[in-house]
Amino acid sequence: MSQIAFDPPYVPRSQCDQALAVHGYAVLHADDVMGWVPASREELAQLHRAWDDLPADAYLKDGGRYRRRRHSCFVIEGAQVTQVPHRPHWQPLAYNALHGGMQRWFEPMAADMLALPVWTRLLQRLGATATALHGERPWFVEAHPFRIDTTDGIGRPTPEGAHRDGVDLVAVFMLDRHAIKGGESRVFAADGPAGQRFTLWQPWSLLLLDDARVIHETTPIQPLVPGELGWRDTLVLTCRRDGFQSA
C-alpha cells in the first residue's frame, strides 16, 4: 500500500505515438502496456522477480544506501535485438551534474531474465516507438532496473534533480510501490513553463519521454510507517541514435 496524490494523465494505447509527438511525453495504463508490448500479466510478473536480486549502487555521491540496480546494453535494428558486451554507464556532466563524467560499472542484468521472450518483445516495441518518433535507424538501448528503498529514511529516485538524459527516448515502467509515500513524477517542457505532476502507482504503467523536449524528475520517497522498509521498483530504458554515450 502507498499514498497517491495525483493520478497519471493516461492516454489510450492507440494515441501513444501522437501524444509523444505533440506533448513530448505519454503515460500508458498497465492494461494498455500489456497490449502495447504485447505481454500477459504473468509474463511481466516473471520479469519483476529479478528485482529481488539487485546489488547496491556503490557510486552514490550523497553517501546514501537507498538505491539498488543493474545495467545492460542492447542494439535494436528493426525486429532484431542484440545484447552488446558489458560496458559502463556514462553520462556527461551536462546531463548529470552529480554522477556524470565517470564510468560506472554496474552488475549486468540476470541472464535468465534476458532470456525470457517477453523481454525481447518489450525491446522490440520500444524500438518501434522510437522509430515512430524519430525515424528508422539502429537504436542503442541502456536498461536500468532500479529499486529505491527507505533504508536511510528517505530514498531519492533522481538524486541529480530535474534533468534530461542525453538520449532520444526514455521509458519508465512502474513495477511496484510498497509502503511508501512520495515518488511523484514531474515532467516539464524544456523550453517553457508547462509541466505535469502525477504519481505512477499501477504495476506496469508506463511513462514515455521525448528526452530532447522535456525535463523529468521523481520526488523522494519516505516510509508510510516510520521504521518500516518501503521501496519503489522501476525499469528505465533509454534509446539513443548514433551510439552509446561514452567518455
Predicted segments with their positions:
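Conserved hydrophobic/aromatic beta-strand scaffold that supports enzyme active sites
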Residues: V27, C73, P145, G161, ...
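Catalytic core of non-heme Fe(II) oxygenases with the double-stranded beta-helix
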Residues: L133-Q202
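Structured loops at beta-to-helix junctions and adjacent beta-edge loops in soluble globular domains
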Residues: D31, I76-A79, H144-F146, M174, ...
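Short loop/turn segments at secondary-structure transitions that flank enzyme active sites
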Residues: M34, D149, R177, I215, ...
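N-terminal auxiliary "cap/dimerization" subdomain that precedes the catalytic jelly-roll/cupin core
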Residues: M1-L93
